[in-house]
Curated annotation (Swiss-Prot):
Pfam families, alphabetized: Thioredoxin
Site keyed Deprotonates C-terminal active site Cys: positions: D40
Domain of life the protein comes from: Eukaryota
Domain Thioredoxin: 2-120
Residues passing through the membrane, by range: none
Species per Swiss-Prot/TrEMBL record: Nicotiana tabacum
Residue pairs linked by disulfide bridges in the UniProt entry: C46-C49
Gene3D superfamilies in alphabetical order: Glutaredoxin (3.40.30.10)
CDD domains per record: TRX_family
Protein name per Swiss-Prot or TrEMBL: Thioredoxin H-type 1
GO function term, MF aspect, one: protein-disulfide reductase activity
Family classification: Belongs to the thioredoxin family. Plant H-type subfamily.
UniProt main location, coarse: cytoplasm
Cytoplasm is among the record's keywords: yes
Length: 126
């Protein structure tokens, strides 16, 4: 399916992960490219999630160097449990396969600030 191909045309979007395989593919892409991955753990019945979704989509358009994923906690229960998600929305910030930060709740300013904070390229210390 062309919609699942990892191509540059995907930049600036929020990608929905509806299967564990899709999650694994995008997670691996984030690790391999050393990009920041922002995961929006959401639920269809969550009002604050619906409020923040267009804001996240707008941020994604402005930051194509960041991978934005959306995971429905009811669809991917194992992924949600693996990342200890207990409230929605929860935004998990991942670099090199590890969680570097988290924002719980539809907090627009905190979400934007945290993305900017972690989207900067990592400085090499040797």
């Amino acid at each position: 399916m062309a919609a699942n191909d990892a191509t540059s045309s995907e930049e600036g979007q929020v990608f929905g992960c509806h299967k564990v395989e899709e999650w694994n593919e995008y997670f691996k892409k984030g690790v391999e490219t050393k990009k920041l991955v922002v995961v929006d753990f959401t639920a269809s019945w969550c009002g604050p999630c619906r409020f923040i979704a267009p804001i996240l989509a707008d941020i994604a358009k402005k930051m194509p160097h960041v991978i934005f994923l959306k995971v429905d906690v009811d669809e991917l229960k194992t992924v949600s449990a693996e990342w200890s998600v207990e409230a929605m929305p929860t935004f998990v910030f991942i670099k090199d396969g590890k969680e570097v930060d988290r924002v719980v709740g539809a907090k627009k300013e905190e979400l934007q600030q945290t993305i900017v904070k972690h989207a900067a390229p990592a400085t090499v210390t040797a």
